[in-house]
Amino acid sequence: MTAKPLHFPSRYTGPTVADVGERAVTLAIQRMAPSSRNGDDAAVLATPAPNTRTVVSTDVLVEGRHFSLNWSSAEEVGRKAIVQNFADIEAMGARPVAALLGLTMPGHTPLNFVQRLIAGMWDKTLQHNSELVGGDLTRADTLIVSITAIGILGGSSPALTLDRARAGQRLVASGPIGYSAAGLALLRHHGRTGIPAGFAPLIDAHCAPTLIPGRGVIARATGATAMTDNSDGLIVDLTTIARRSNVRIDLDSAAITPDSLLRKAGDHLGIDPWSWVLTGGEDHTLLATTTSDAPSGFRTIGRVHRTHAAAHVTMDGYPPTYTAGWESF
């Protein structure tokens, strides 16, 4: 079966990447995201300071699967690509310092689209005091954005790995939960232009999620032991921590109750907003376990207990109503 040709919105005008050629596209990217480390066969990064480690992560975004040009701008796709990759670095308690881009696209892709995509990436890398240091381009029928993020983990303390949650700790979160899923539901129902007023925070959370720089580093410095980001759904992501750590995580329903905006969206669409909170994912909110009080910028949303046969993740002591999440296959 032949794939349907990718359509770019009319706001992206001018020559295509096929018109100008690979070298001109590469030069345009370098101009939009200038870095002294970009432009050679490989990027040369400074040697990390003593008593530090390098952290690396990769995520791939596919048009039609992870984003849609029907409602996301090129800048938003670029911002989202960086945020979801840097969230993985932050979730280890590390600091993002660089990113590499792998980009596949059809020949009729407007050069202006690529420039705006890179502008979105550059905006987010600057927020984290990092750089886009290189990558690769190729032609394909599908628009695919792949980011490899590189970070630095300072000091000798362990990284915030998934297997270090312990009974007696509190579960803390930094950021919204359920907003991205609610935004996606609104977009699927209305498209970008038909959404009623007041839902902009939900749309923004899906199309261009935010990540406050340094939250993972702060959590690690103040006693957090395990951390992940809410990418595949709250229950799914917490179940991974619970299984790897051999504990049970009990959510406090009062701490994660859908707020007025989620309830309004749920009423509008006829969807239980709890499904967005528990299974939505793609908020890239940081979730951590700690023996200390909630770090700055975090709030307590549950407790860690010894494991038992009932479930790895419970809410107010009982199995949650919704347990699904994002899966690639």
Task: Describe each region flagged by the PLM.
Residues M1-S73, M92, L101, R116, ...:
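Extreme N-terminal cap/leader segments of soluble proteins
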Residues T2-P5, T13, V17, G21, ...:
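Acidic, Ser/Thr/Pro-rich beta/coil linker or hinge segments at domain junctions
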Residues H7, L61, V97-H190:
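Glycine-rich anion-binding loops of enzyme active sites
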Residues R37, V55-S57, E131-G135, A149, ...:
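General beta-strand structural signal in soluble alpha/beta enzymes
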Residues A74-A98, A119-Q127, G214-V217, G233-I241:
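Small-aliphatic-rich amphipathic alpha-helix that forms the alpha element of a beta-alpha
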Residues H108, I203-G280:
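Active-site-proximal betaalpha loop/short-helix elements
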Residues I150, L287-T291:
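Short hydrophobic/aromatic beta-strand micro-patches
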